[in-house]
């Protein structure tokens, strides 16, 4: 079956729109679908996503498609960019409409709610073994990507040919550098754990602890990510790359991050509900914290920062008390062999 579009993007929030803009700016015919018909009509009329990326015009190659069946029939390349808690639902909705030659890639960052499973497991449960899978991950703020500011990400998948073709589709010498990676698990995990640590970094700054504390938290957060990755069979080298250290530093240090701003509000005394309302968009790290905590407990992986953030978000502990507990932990060597 021939493609009438080079790629279809499912998810018309800020990040899905930004990726669609980037792809279309490369000259690729890109279809953008979202779940809200009224929102899609507005996008088609305005030729921009005023709600999430105001003032950034759509390239000529970007087309709005409100009909999911038509969007999925147009291309065998499907990029899913929806919140992690609806990832499985969207795949289930798409399944009967997918082409036989479809290939699925996602930029969703997170794990399955309640179970803490990787999204690859969710995708296989919903779709079976038929379709090649891939994931995009790395330090990307949607606004900067949509504006064409220099950005770098990584891509990994189950099919080397699909991964290579995604690199070609996404890569742009002027705006986006794309690195191929063979660690499918590591790329998925990095995108979830960094959201949790970013909340902690925000809480630390909201309390007023300063740059020293924030840097220590980022560094030890990377240790927690690496421990969890090793337990799942990921490569430790991945966590020194775009999807690990890169995404962690970006999300923990810049207020474009909703997770960081959420943590800032908590550190300044807001309760969880008020902080979420203050952000005004989905705070992926809120759910990710429970998911990562659940996964770590199941695997027996020690993640003290994640545990304290979980207690703040779900058990009512104050950020100050969480910080005190972390600082008061038993002394130990930084070198894992000792």
UniProtKB/Swiss-Prot annotation:
<feature type="binding site">
    <location>
        <position position="109"/>
    </location>
    <ligand>
        <name>NADPH</name>
    </ligand>
</feature>
<feature type="binding site">
    <location>
        <position position="282"/>
    </location>
    <ligand>
        <name>NADPH</name>
    </ligand>
</feature>
<dbReference type="GO" id="GO:0005975">
    <property type="term" value="P:carbohydrate metabolic process"/>
</dbReference>
<feature type="binding site">
    <location>
        <position position="247"/>
    </location>
    <ligand>
        <name>sn-glycerol 3-phosphate</name>
    </ligand>
</feature>
<keyword id="KW-0521">NADP</keyword>
<dbReference type="InterPro" id="IPR008927">
    <property type="entry name" value="6-PGluconate_DH-like_C_sf"/>
</dbReference>
<dbReference type="GO" id="GO:0005829">
    <property type="term" value="C:cytosol"/>
</dbReference>
<dbReference type="InterPro" id="IPR006109">
    <property type="entry name" value="G3P_DH_NAD-dep_C"/>
</dbReference>
<keyword id="KW-0444">Lipid biosynthesis</keyword>
<feature type="binding site">
    <location>
        <position position="15"/>
    </location>
    <ligand>
        <name>NADPH</name>
    </ligand>
</feature>
<dbReference type="GO" id="GO:0006072">
    <property type="term" value="P:glycerol-3-phosphate metabolic process"/>
</dbReference>
<dbReference type="InterPro" id="IPR006168">
    <property type="entry name" value="G3P_DH_NAD-dep"/>
</dbReference>
<feature type="binding site">
    <location>
        <position position="257"/>
    </location>
    <ligand>
        <name>sn-glycerol 3-phosphate</name>
    </ligand>
</feature>
<comment type="pathway">
    <text>Membrane lipid metabolism; glycerophospholipid metabolism.</text>
</comment>
<dbReference type="GO" id="GO:0046474">
    <property type="term" value="P:glycerophospholipid biosynthetic process"/>
</dbReference>
<dbReference type="InterPro" id="IPR036291">
    <property type="entry name" value="NAD(P)-bd_dom_sf"/>
</dbReference>
<feature type="active site" description="Proton acceptor">
    <location>
        <position position="194"/>
    </location>
</feature>
<feature type="binding site">
    <location>
        <position position="194"/>
    </location>
    <ligand>
        <name>sn-glycerol 3-phosphate</name>
    </ligand>
</feature>
<dbReference type="Pfam" id="PF07479">
    <property type="entry name" value="NAD_Gly3P_dh_C"/>
</dbReference>
<feature type="binding site">
    <location>
        <position position="142"/>
    </location>
    <ligand>
        <name>NADPH</name>
    </ligand>
</feature>
<dbReference type="GO" id="GO:0046168">
    <property type="term" value="P:glycerol-3-phosphate catabolic process"/>
</dbReference>
<keyword id="KW-0594">Phospholipid biosynthesis</keyword>
<feature type="binding site">
    <location>
        <position position="284"/>
    </location>
    <ligand>
        <name>NADPH</name>
    </ligand>
</feature>
<keyword id="KW-0560">Oxidoreductase</keyword>
<feature type="binding site">
    <location>
        <position position="35"/>
    </location>
    <ligand>
        <name>NADPH</name>
    </ligand>
</feature>
<feature type="binding site">
    <location>
        <position position="258"/>
    </location>
    <ligand>
        <name>NADPH</name>
    </ligand>
</feature>
<feature type="binding site">
    <location>
        <position position="14"/>
    </location>
    <ligand>
        <name>NADPH</name>
    </ligand>
</feature>
<feature type="binding site">
    <location>
        <position position="138"/>
    </location>
    <ligand>
        <name>sn-glycerol 3-phosphate</name>
    </ligand>
</feature>
<keyword id="KW-0547">Nucleotide-binding</keyword>
<dbReference type="GO" id="GO:0047952">
    <property type="term" value="F:glycerol-3-phosphate dehydrogenase [NAD(P)+] activity"/>
</dbReference>
<comment type="similarity">
    <text>Belongs to the NAD-dependent glycerol-3-phosphate dehydrogenase family.</text>
</comment>
<dbReference type="InterPro" id="IPR011128">
    <property type="entry name" value="G3P_DH_NAD-dep_N"/>
</dbReference>
<dbReference type="GO" id="GO:0046167">
    <property type="term" value="P:glycerol-3-phosphate biosynthetic process"/>
</dbReference>
<dbReference type="Pfam" id="PF01210">
    <property type="entry name" value="NAD_Gly3P_dh_N"/>
</dbReference>
<keyword id="KW-0443">Lipid metabolism</keyword>
<keyword id="KW-0520">NAD</keyword>
<keyword id="KW-1208">Phospholipid metabolism</keyword>
<dbReference type="InterPro" id="IPR013328">
    <property type="entry name" value="6PGD_dom2"/>
</dbReference>
<dbReference type="GO" id="GO:0051287">
    <property type="term" value="F:NAD binding"/>
</dbReference>
<feature type="binding site">
    <location>
        <position position="259"/>
    </location>
    <ligand>
        <name>sn-glycerol 3-phosphate</name>
    </ligand>
</feature>
<comment type="function">
    <text>Catalyzes the reduction of the glycolytic intermediate dihydroxyacetone phosphate (DHAP) to sn-glycerol 3-phosphate (G3P), the key precursor for phospholipid synthesis.</text>
</comment>
<feature type="binding site">
    <location>
        <position position="140"/>
    </location>
    <ligand>
        <name>sn-glycerol 3-phosphate</name>
    </ligand>
</feature>
